[in-house]
A protein has these predicted regions:
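A conserved regulatory-domain signal marking ACT and ACT-like small-molecule sensing domains
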Residues: 1-89
Length: 89
C-alpha cells in the first residue's frame, strides 16, 4: 500500500524555530532527500524527531535559517513545501 506524502509547516507552535513535518512512505534515502531540500533552502536542522512504523515515516524537523533566524516568509515556506512534495512525491 502506497502512503501519500504530506508536508506540514508550522510557524506558530515554537517561538524560535519553524517545524517541518513530513509524513511519507518509508524508503531508503528518505532522510537524505529531505535534508538536501532543507539545505538548498538555507535551513539548519536544530532538532529532528524521526519515527517509522509499518512502512510509514513521520519525520519532524525544527529548523532555523543559516543566520540563526526563524523562517517565517510564507512565499519561501510555500516553495519549500512544493519542493519537498516534488522530491518525495
Amino acid at each position: 500500500m502506497e502512503l501519500p506524502t504530506r508536508i506540514r509547516i508550522d510557524t506558530q507552535s515554537v517561538e524560535s524555530r519553524t517545524i517541518v513535518e513530513v509524513e511519507s512512505e518509508d524508503r531508503l534515502g528518505l532522510l537524505h532527500r529531505i535534508s538536501n531540500v532543507l539545505t538548498r533552502h538555507d535551513l539548519n536542522i536544530h532538532v529532528a524527531r524521526i519515527s517509522t512504523e509499518k512502512g510509514a515515516a513521520i519525520d519532524t524537523f525544527y529548523v532555523r535559517t543559516k543566520s540563526g533566524g526563524k523562517p517565517t516568509d510564507e512565499n519561501k515556506l510555500d516553495e519549500l513545501k512544493r519542493e519537498l512534495e516534488t522530491e518525495l512525491g
